[in-house]
């Protein structure tokens, strides 16, 4: 068995490279799966309800959202993995719990905005999401500077999405 330089959460045994790679794959699958659940509700509404509502002139083209979100989900997954990797799940429980909260809020936004057609409610929810991302970034930065910095593009995109959400809400109120 090939041994990595990483130690177990208790520091008593080395962790195999295989386990580290499996952790990364699981992290990526979890994040992309969460994104897929949100997209499953979003996609049918892009050509339906979303086409019929007023949007600002600076609204990005629909095709840009898939690649941007896919990239962000992979970056989020790597960040979570970097927090989990050196210490394990028990030792990183608090920052990973925050990560889980923001991931659930991320999915919930799609449901509220696209499935329920409630831009006002979605705006309140995305503000909560923004706060959860900031809290996750702070917790991640304490464990890994790289992990925290990997969430910066996500925070920037959600900041933009918040302004877009607010504008759509006001245009259609």
Regions found by a protein language model. Name each.
Residues 1-19:
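Short, Lys/Arg-rich, polar N-terminal cytosolic tail immediately upstream
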Residues 14-41:
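N-terminal signal-anchor transmembrane alpha helix
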Residues 44-57, 171:
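Membrane-interface helix termini and inter-helical loops of multi-pass transporters
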Residues 59-75, 116-129:
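Membrane-interface loop-to-helix entry segments
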Residues 74-110:
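Helix-adjacent hinge/juxtasegments
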Residues 111-121, 169-173:
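Membrane-interface helix caps and helix-loop-helix hairpins in membrane proteins
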Residues 113-119, 135-148:
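Membrane-helix boundary connector in multi-pass membrane proteins
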Residues 139-173:
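Terminal transmembrane helical module of multi-pass membrane proteins
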């Amino acid at each position: 068995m090939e041994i990595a330089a990483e130690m177990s959460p208790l520091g008593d045994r080395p962790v195999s490279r295989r386990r580290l790679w499996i952790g990364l794959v699981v992290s990526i699958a979890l994040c992309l799966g969460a994104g897929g659940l949100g997209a499953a509700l979003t996609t049918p509404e892009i050509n339906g309800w979303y086409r019929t509502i007023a949007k600002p002139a600076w609204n990005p083209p629909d095709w840009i959202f898939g690649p941007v979100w896919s990239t962000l989900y992979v970056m989020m997954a790597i960040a979570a993995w970097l927090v989990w990797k050196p210490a394990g799940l028990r030792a990183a429980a608090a920052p990973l719990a925050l990560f889980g909260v923001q991931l659930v809020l991320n999915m919930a936004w799609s449901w509220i905005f696209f499935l329920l057609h409630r831009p006002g409610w979605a705006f309140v929810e995305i503000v909560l999401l923004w706060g959860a991302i900031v809290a996750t970034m702070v917790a991640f930065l304490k464990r890994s500077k790289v992990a925290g910095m990997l969430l910066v593009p996500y925070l920037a995109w959600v900041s933009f999405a918040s302004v877009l959400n607010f504008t759509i809400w006001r245009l259609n109120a």
